[in-house]
């Protein structure tokens, strides 16, 4: 399909090179440094160059507050998410001088300026720039960098100055619409002069529509939030969004028709690794066969291990019995062999033989009577044959014998329980193995299902505990507020182990053991929760990684024309501001002249059909078939800088009359400015 576009990551900018020929080519008081200090992007260069040397985002990044700042194109796309990012601007006003200083440091360093700055500076500022913002800028330029002179001007007016010759009368009477990232301004020019008192500002720019588009995508596709960063959303807005050319509501209704909506929509295909289902089925069958082979191999290994163990025990038993047989033929050799085998007495040898027979045949040899006879000999002698001391000793041995019998009884009981548990476990393992061999796929699916149910129960119990903790915390807060009720404040109940929890833990351990045995590729529940495990047999397709932009394509740019209706910002729309705030204040003849020449500048006017929409709206308020010229800046990224360059070249001989020198700054204060075509209104 033609309306499917692949997701492309934003490439990081190339590092700017340091200028090597500043001393020979640019270090001249007659060559101004031009800085278009935009709130979104900064452009800087020399007036004798045809284009700026530096173009970068107006952002400053830091790892820590004490670390060196990363500025300009040294700030890569991947750094934005891990650094603390600051902008010198709030909206389009300078509010953070340290960040602006870092930007100036970057500019002058890349220009190759090592010591004194010999060039004058032209720098753009926002319309109706507050005095305290200009104060920050003047202090930096004159006191920090020792600039000789500076000119302040408005970027949109410089842009108009650079292209006004394209109008038939040189733009004598014109309407300028400057829509940037953060704000939009409307100026009207009468008799080659800007009427600053009638200039209007709207706090909506391209950034507002980008934010709105990003929120819509995040709401519509929450699983794909990470792809749509601010920069990437701005990129797709510039590539795929467009302004309604005429009646917005009528175009909006077109999306009610499924066929038209499909034709007008675009799809962003996010990164996705395509699945070959034929290979997937082959892989599934291979895994099933591998599991069967694994089961057979496990049985074979277990049988082999049991046989080896049995053979080893039989050989050891035969060796010990041969030693015991020496007692009947050669007592002396028997005693020597006992010592060489580290047996202290014949009793130790017999005990080992009995233990081996128990392991091999499961028959217990009763040797306790012999042990008791040797350990408690007085118990087997009549009282009449014992003296008083021996009777006391016999009484003591009887007590010891009773205690020993009790311990042996407990041990036998524990051994029996262990034996039963072991038999039960062996029987369970045997049944599980039979189930696995019968149908490996169904068996593993059942194991995963049982495991998921336990994890769901755990999650539900955890939520209940959190709610209970909130209730307890609120209760303690009420106790603090009410000091009369302080009987058990601060006390914590003993944590009692939940039998159900303990049983679930045992069941989970068994399931993990079985999964590790029959499905080694399975991930332990201790590492990954059930939310992260996809159900067996469920696969994602390319459509699951597609983001469709339909009505959003015209809805987001419309925020400039209907900010209150769409995003709830209590501002006039662009056309409403033009009509009610500017044209209604002008005489009919002047209104006709001003609206005959319209100049569009700023990055936001590059939105598709923006010029057509302005033509449609302005034509509604003009006489039918009256001439109307709408001129859009050739390159909105460089237009203000190029216009400022043209203005500098035109005013080279008049520089002292339009610039503020350091002496002016020191004598007349930071709020002193000189008027020229592109300057703010001077109240001096």
Curated annotation (Swiss-Prot):
SUPFAM superfamilies: Actin-like ATPase domain. Keywords: Coiled coil, DNA damage, DNA recombination, DNA repair, Nucleus, Transcription, Transcription regulation. Gene3D superfamilies: 3.30.420.40, Actin, Chain A, domain 4. One of its GO terms (cellular component) is Ino80 complex. InterPro entries: Actin (IPR004000), ATPase_NBD (IPR043129). The keyword tRNA processing does not apply. The keyword DNA damage applies. Residues 402-443 have a biased composition (Basic and acidic residues). It is found in: Nucleus. Transmembrane segments: none annotated. Residues 262-469 form a coiled coil. GO terms for biological process: DNA recombination; DNA repair; regulation of DNA-templated transcription. Residues 392-443, 481-500 are annotated as: Disordered. Its main location: nucleus. Belongs to the actin family. ARP5 subfamily. Component of the chromatin-remodeling Ino80 complex. Proposed core component of the chromatin remodeling Ino80 complex which is involved in transcriptional regulation, DNA replication and probably DNA repair. PANTHER family: ACTIN. This is Actin-related protein 5. It comes from Dictyostelium discoideum (Social amoeba). The gene is arpE.
């Amino acid at each position: 399909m033609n309306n499917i576009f692949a997701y492309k990551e934003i490439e990081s900018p190339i590092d700017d090179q340091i200028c090597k020929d500043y001393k020979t080519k640019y270090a001249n008081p007659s060559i101004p440094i031009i800085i278009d200090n935009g709130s979104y992007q900064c452009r800087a260069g020399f007036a004798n160059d045809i284009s700026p040397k530096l173009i970068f985002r107006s952002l400053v990044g830091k790892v820590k507050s004490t670390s060196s700042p990363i500025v300009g194109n040294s700030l890569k796309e991947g750094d934005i998410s891990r650094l603390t990012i600051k902008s010198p601007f709030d909206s389009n006003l300078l509010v953070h001088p340290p960040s602006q200083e870092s930007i100036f440091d970057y500019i002058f360093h890349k220009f190759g300026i090592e010591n004194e700055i010999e060039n004058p500076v032209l720098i753009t500022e926002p319309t109706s720039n507050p005095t305290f913002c200009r104060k920050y800028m003047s202090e930096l330029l004159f006191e920090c960098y020792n600039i000789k002179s500076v000119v302040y001007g408005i970027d949109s007016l410089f842009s108009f100055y650079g292209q006004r010759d394209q109008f038939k009368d040189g733009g004598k009477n014109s309407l300028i619409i400057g829509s940037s990232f953060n704000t939009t301004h409307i100026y009207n020019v009468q008799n080659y002069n800007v009427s600053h008192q009638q200039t209007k500002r709207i706090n909506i720019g391209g950034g507002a529509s980008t934010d709105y588009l990003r929120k819509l995508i995040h709401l519509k596709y929450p699983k794909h939030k990470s792809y749509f960063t601010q920069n990437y959303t701005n990129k797709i807005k510039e590539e795929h969004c467009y302004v309604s050319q005429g009646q917005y509501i009528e175009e909006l209704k077109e999306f009610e028709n499924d066929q038209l909506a499909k034709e007008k929509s675009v799809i962003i295909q996010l990164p996705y690794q395509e699945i070959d289902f034929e290979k997937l089925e082959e892989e599934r069958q291979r895994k099933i066969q591998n599991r069967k082979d694994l089961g057979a191999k496990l049985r074979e290994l277990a049988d082999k291990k049991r046989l080896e163990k049995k053979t080893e025990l039989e050989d050891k038993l035969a060796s010990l019995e041969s030693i015991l047989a020496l007692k009947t033929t050669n007592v002396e050799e028997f005693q020597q062999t006992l010592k060489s085998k580290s047996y202290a007495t014949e009793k130790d040898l017999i005990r080992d033989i009995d233990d081996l027979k128990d392991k091999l045949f499961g028959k217990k040899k009763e040797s306790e009577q012999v042990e008791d006879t040797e350990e408690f000999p007085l118990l087997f002698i009549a009282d009449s044959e014992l003296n008083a001391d021996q009777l006391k000793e016999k009484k003591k041995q009887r007590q010891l014998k009773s205690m020993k019998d009790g311990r042996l009884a407990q041990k036998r009981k524990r051994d029996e329980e262990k034996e039963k548990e072991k038999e039960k476990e062996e029987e369970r393992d045997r049944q599980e193995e039979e189930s696995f061999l019968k149908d490996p796929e169904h068996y593993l699916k059942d194991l995963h299902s049982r495991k998921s149910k336990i994890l769901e129960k755990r999650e539900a119990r955890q939520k209940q505990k959190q709610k209970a903790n909130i209730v307890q915390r609120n209760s303690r807060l009420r106790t603090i507020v009410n000091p009369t009720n302080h009987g058990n404040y601060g006390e914590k109940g003993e944590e009692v182990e939940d039998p159900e929890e303990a049983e679930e833990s045992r069941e989970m351990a068994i399931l993990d053991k079985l999964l590790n045995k029959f499905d080694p590729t399975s991930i332990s529940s201790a590492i990954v929760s059930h939310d992260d495990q996809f159900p067996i047999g469920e696969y994602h397709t390319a459509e699951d990684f597609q983001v469709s932009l339909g009505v959003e394509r015209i809805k987001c740019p419309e925020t400039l024309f209907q900010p209150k209706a769409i995003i709830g910002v209590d501002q006039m729309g662009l056309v409403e501001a033009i009509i009610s705030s500017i044209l209604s204040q002008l005489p009919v003849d002047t209104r006709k002249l001003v609206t005959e020449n319209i100049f569009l500048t700023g990055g936001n006017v590059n939105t598709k059909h923006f010029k057509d929409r302005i033509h449609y709206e302005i034509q509604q308020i003009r006489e039918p078939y009256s001439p109307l010229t709408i001129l859009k800046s050739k390159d909105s990224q460089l237009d203000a800088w190029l216009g400022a360059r043209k203005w500098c070249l035109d005013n080279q001989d008049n520089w002292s009359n339009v610039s503020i020198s350091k002496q002016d700054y020191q004598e007349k204060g930071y709020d002193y400015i000189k008027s020229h075509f592109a300057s703010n209104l001077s109240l001096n």
